[in-house]
């Protein structure tokens, strides 16, 4: 266990030790949730388009009667996935494990490069940033099933995770734990959302009218369709 902790610290120091003024500014803004508000708006818009009344191929025989409720269920699913991930990571695991953040670890005093004096809260295991971004990204990937969107969102998750280590507020193990929680919540929420949406569609349009869920990129309209 001590060896693993040592490796964890060494990886953190290596990441945090590579710094510059421009990287400080970049990682600071990557780590801020408000930086990504336009991305969140884009994701909502894509959900509305793909699963709402504007979708050209959502339900069999053009049935779109339950489009509003369908979209609301999916958006509520995102709120549940991210909200539960945040609660589990920050409200349960951090105060239970009580692992100090690197910035509050006496053994690392004076060894970390701090950006804008930022040290974060007292405990760091697991990373809420990692959990929340993974929950959002994976749930969208499971719903939308587009390889380009999935790749872009996974890059977004990776940047957020790297920024937390660059800022010195999380060990790599904190990040890995957060990613696992976010992935679990996204997977569970995806199954729940699918069942609810199918039930709503069947009640609205009759048996056999359930949503045709995308299975891959071929399910999306192209310029030739």
Predicted regions and their residues:
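N-terminal transmembrane-helix/juxtamembrane module of multi-pass inner/ER membrane proteins
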Residues: 1-40, 58-59, 89-120, 211-212, ...
């Amino acid at each position: 266990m001590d060896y693993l902790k040592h490796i964890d610290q060494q990886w953190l120091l290596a990441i945090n030790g590579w710094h510059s003024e421009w990287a400080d500014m970049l990682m600071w803004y990557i780590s801020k949730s408000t930086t990504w508000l336009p991305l969140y708006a884009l994701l909502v818009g894509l959900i509305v388009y793909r699963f709402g009344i504007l979708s050209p191929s959502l339900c069999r025989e053009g049935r779109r009667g339950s489009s509003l409720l369908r979209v609301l269920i999916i958006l509520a699913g995102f709120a549940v996935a991210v909200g539960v991930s945040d609660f589990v990571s920050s409200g349960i695991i951090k105060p239970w494990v009580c692992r100090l953040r690197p910035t509050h670890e006496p053994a690392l005093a004076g060894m970390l490069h701090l950006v804008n004096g930022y040290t974060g809260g007292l405990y760091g295991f697991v990373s809420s940033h990692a959990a929340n971004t993974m929950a959002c990204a994976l749930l969208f990937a499971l719903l939308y099933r587009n390889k380009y969107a999935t790749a872009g969102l996974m890059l977004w998750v990776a940047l957020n995770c790297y920024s937390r280590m660059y800022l010195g507020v999380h060990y790599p193990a904190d990040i890995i734990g957060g990613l696992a929680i976010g992935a679990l919540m996204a997977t569970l929420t995806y199954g729940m959302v699918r069942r609810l949406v199918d039930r709503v569609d069947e009640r609205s349009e009759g048996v056999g009218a359930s949503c045709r869920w995308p299975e891959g990129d071929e399910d999306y309209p192209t310029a030739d369709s």
